């Protein structure tokens, strides 16, 4: 088993300027998305590098605004009601994938209107580039020691002791005394072994989904299909990994005694993705390749 290193949140300090790991991960995510989108544009007659620059700008804006607003609405709504200014306290952290996803969709919709494309022409073009952002984001979560997984006694070598979870571990120990045999002391704090669910998500929602989507979209597919595969891939991955991820402290299990907020938000993505995929192939409209209607 491993002990989380408790990395310094500052990745690089240049005099008074401090670059935090999480900010660096966002920078890498946007830079990688731009590079991949630029490459894809070189393979498409109806996309230019200027359009890619605009697209990434709209996407970045959607991620940041949507991610923050979504986090506050989905996970901290009570705090927002009591203190509306909490929405602006971005320095305290808090981003939601599902909120960022909605923000990106809105950004892509505005982009599509500007360049007279359909929304799904834009979505299908950019979705293969999105999982790399999820990959870097989850690595950032791991470095920060946040969004850790559930306690496990499985004895797996990769289980991790997160000192950041010490206070929560003590609460779990009080309600489950049988966990006593698993506890160890780290820097004066008593912690339990947990699944490094951030890395599970980085691997499944990030690396694996990127590889599959990149391959899938490298050949002509009907309009809407790539977007549908993304929804299915992310939704299924997130739904499964939520069984290993510790539910948010202030949320817990919100449905049926086992379903988390992440699963509740991912289920509609799975359903929508399946419906869209069936519809896309049934309709059979192609935007490039021999079957495209120019």
UniProtKB/Swiss-Prot annotation:
Gene Ontology MF annotations: phosphatidylglycerol-prolipoprotein diacylglyceryl transferase activity
GO BP terms: lipoprotein biosynthetic process
TM region(s), chain numbering: 10-30, 55-75, 91-111, 119-139, 196-216, 224-244, 258-278
Membrane-related topology note: Multi-pass membrane protein
GO cellular component, one term: plasma membrane
InterPro entries found in the cross-reference section: Lgt
Top-rank taxon, per record: Bacteria
EC number: 2.5.1.145
A Pfam entry, by short name: LGT
Pathway assigned in UniProt: Protein modification; lipoprotein biosynthesis (diacylglyceryl transfer)
Classification via PROSITE patterns: LGT
Protein's UniProt keywords contain Nucleotide-binding: no
Chain sites annotated for binding a 1,2-diacyl-sn-glycero-3-phospho-(1'-sn-glycerol): 138
Function: Catalyzes the transfer of the diacylglyceryl group from phosphatidylglycerol to the sulfhydryl group of the N-terminal cysteine of a prolipoprotein, the first step in the formation of mature lipoproteins.
Protein name: Phosphatidylglycerol--prolipoprotein diacylglyceryl transferase
Species for this entry: Psychrobacter arcticus (strain DSM 17307 / VKM B-2377 / 273-4)
